[in-house]
Amino acid sequence: MQRSIMSFFQPTKEGKAKKPEKETPSSIREKEPPPKVALKERNQVVPESDSPVKRTGRKVAQVLSCEGEDEDEAPGTPKVQKPVSDSEQSSPPSPDTCPENSPVFNCSSPMDISPSGFPKRRTARKQLPKRTIQDTLEEQNEDKTKTAKKRKKEEETPKESLAEAEDIKQKEEKEGDQLIVPSEPTKSPESVTLTKTENIPVCKAGVKLKPQEEEQSKPPARGAKTLSSFFTPRKPAVKTEVKQEESGTLRKEETKGTLDPANYNPSKNNYHPIEDACWKHGQKVPFLAVARTFEKIEEVSARLKMVETLSNLLRSVVALSPPDLLPVLYLSLNRLGPPQQGLELGVGDGVLLKAVAQATGRQLESIRAEVAEKGDVGLVAENSRSTQRLMLPPPPLTISGVFTKFCDIARLTGSASMAKKMDIIKGLFVACRHSEARYIARSLSGRLRLGLAEQSVLAALAQAVSLTPPGQEFPTVVVDAGKGKTAEARKMWLEEQGMILKQTFCEVPDLDRIIPVLLEHGLERLPEHCKLSPGVPLKPMLAHPTRGVSEVLKRFEEVDFTCEYKYDGQRAQIHVLEGGEVKIFSRNQEDNTGKYPDIISRIPKIKHPSVTSFILDTEAVAWDREKKQIQPFQVLTTRKRKEVDASEIQVQVCLYAFDLIYLNGESLVRQPLSRRRQLLRENFVETEGEFVFTTSLDTKDTEQIAEFLEQSVKDSCEGLMVKTLDVDATYEIAKRSHNWLKLKKDYLDGVGDTLDLVVIGAYLGRGKRAGRYGGFLLAAYDEESEELQAICKLGTGFSDEELEEHHQSLQALVLPTPRPYVRIDGAVAPDHWLDPSIVWEVKCADLSLSPIYPAARGLVDKEKGISLRFPRFIRVRKDKQPEQATTSNQVASLYRKQSQIQNQQSSDLDSDVEDY
């Protein structure tokens, strides 16, 4: 009959006996069956093929003949005892090497190996003197009984205190039948509490030890550490003390960059750029730190607080990770480089929403509905990302990594570029944490919606490098250079430092050139190393509008001025470098060199041989060579914009030069206009139809100015530019100055200027305009909120042909819902929403407060916006982007100026906020 494997481990029937009703301890020792599991099996020794009876007999024989060896049947004992350390278990002593009747704990390792080369097992029982088989059985049974009682007690009170465990130990030691062996604690749940005590009973012996042997058997003192420190675990109590000591000693050393980026707060008072940073010196700036900064900026509306918050982040970047300063600045400006590089993300809302849907596992329609409800694709992306959990999250995003990915997206071209862009965007969203997805989505859409204008970012940068000067060796010594100054002195000092950076940026509006110099030489020496030079486009000087000749005379009453034709064309800034290379830039610093190959070919013959380098400010105007007259602006817009072949040019252009900014290595921006004009005419030569000086008139006579204005209109010009010649006549880069005034024919009966507005919607026509658009909803651009705010409904100024043309061209821009950044408030919703990408020039009779339209709301009146009265379409501005449209601040300024003139308060004109 075949037997099961378990039957070999069951006690024989002869060994079993019925227990009496009352048993004595001795009877328990005599009658209790042997254990069910052998120690060999617990030690992973393969059972031999002998029967259980033979194996039991052999074990008994070994007990009688082996020194200090106990029986193997004690299943309960290992759960209570502390096992011997790993080093001792791996090298058990040979019975021949240990002296008789001596409980030795450590035997020489060479003798621990059997002749066959296998290590011998070793237990605590092998250290005991020889015993008889009867004593062994009695001790084993008694040990099992006590162990069972102790285990039961431990299960009832698993969290026994240290003192109670010590009492148990002392009580058992007094009985004289206990040998304590310090060893590694077991991992069984029952022994968790006991491992907290230092000396717990392990095994019992039936032999009384001599006094010397008892001393040897006592556990070593707590501080002695006789066992190997590598294999012996530290006691939990000691470990806790060590942790506390270590944390106390390292706390001061690890205060730099120890915060979680999710808790980073750059808006805190008394910010320390090193101790309050969330990364350490030499590490890359976490993108989450930038996102947290944007969050704090978004929470406040005060400009000074916004500048301070961004400045604190920049201080930490300067002190800890200077190479990341440039990416942080570009992402704060929502740019990828200087304008002349032409790097744009080119990610539409459709692609962005698809990427969010695929990265988060949500349905596209659900995301679109949520965007329509919340009006912010960034918040939708953040909420979608926060609901997804990943088993293996990607590494955290860094500012340099995100910036590099954005640049990769901008450089991708070709038929497969959209799929590649989608993959990059999805990868970014998958790696996002917390609010990172919000600002990734907003950056990709082109609108951060922080209210951080360029001047605010420059102010924050100037403040950062002033308080925490760059170039210091770490650890940074000066973290707050303004410490010790009074509040007023500190404010004035920071303003002076800010002016240094702003003036330098006006002449060199290229952070790629400014930041390396700033980090190496500091802000004070920045003007020495960053100077105006050909090849870097400048922001042009702009003019303020006026409403009549009388206003011009009042402003320039005591100074000499000149009147120049205002040509209707495109601003062209001509740069010629020392090596002869020619660059042509637009008013927005875009590189238009490829658009004008015909102009490049003319450069050698329009300058004198002595001229080696220069920067000219000109107007490129469409020119009819046959009729020798200026053509309308609309003709110029039909010219191809990129990669133009000179042989295919149909629309010819003529350059009208009106200013000289740089000549032969010398900047002329601080020279008066009279000197600049003189140098222009001395060093350049006119060529009819190709290069001509602007027509001008120097006079103070009212009648002459009026006649000159009429003549400019007859010569196909917009009007006049009136400029001071000597007093306050420097070239003010990137500034709309009162020293240059615009005087147009239309201004005499209007508000003083036309407005460039964005088309955001269209109304279906009725009557004779049925079947096409009859009206349009226009909006101004608000720089702070980065919104397009509705300002008026436009329906006049169009010919039938223009209406048909607009209807056809705008069909491709129809949207089911408005863009999130479009705000109309109480205005009548259009029949068709349009993608806000078209800019129109509009003229109006007047401006008025409006409870319906949101444009400039809060700037003039707390509750009302501003609208146009009798608006009229003038032309399409193909040279302008929506962000370059008339701003809400400009609308408010036009309204105030109109009110001042009506109330004859022209003296207050100087209070207008200038764009500096």
Curated annotation (Swiss-Prot):
DNA ligase that seals nicks in double-stranded during DNA repair. Also involved in DNA replication and DNA recombination. The modification N6-acetyllysine is found at K144, K225. The modification Phosphoserine is found at S49, S51, S65, S228, S229, S799, S906, S907, S911. Residues 1-197, 236-266, 879-916 are annotated as: Disordered. This is DNA ligase 1. The modification Phosphothreonine is found at T77, T193, T232, T796. Keywords: Acetylation, ATP-binding, Cell cycle, Cell division, DNA damage, DNA recombination, DNA repair, DNA replication, Ligase, Magnesium, Metal-binding, Nucleotide-binding, Nucleus, Phosphoprotein. It comes from Mus musculus (Mouse). Its EC number is 6.5.1.1. It is found in: Nucleus. The gene is Lig1. Residues 119-129 have a biased composition (Basic residues). Residues 1-10, 99-111, 185-197, 883-908 have a biased composition (Polar residues). Pfam families: DNA_ligase_A_C (PF04679), DNA_ligase_A_M (PF01068), DNA_ligase_A_N (PF04675). The record marks R303, N588, K768, K793 as: Interaction with target DNA. It is an enzyme of class 6 (ligase). Interacts with PCNA. Interacts with POLB. Residues 447-456, 640-642 are annotated as: Interaction with target DNA. Its cofactor is Mg(2+). Mg(2+) 2 binds at E718.
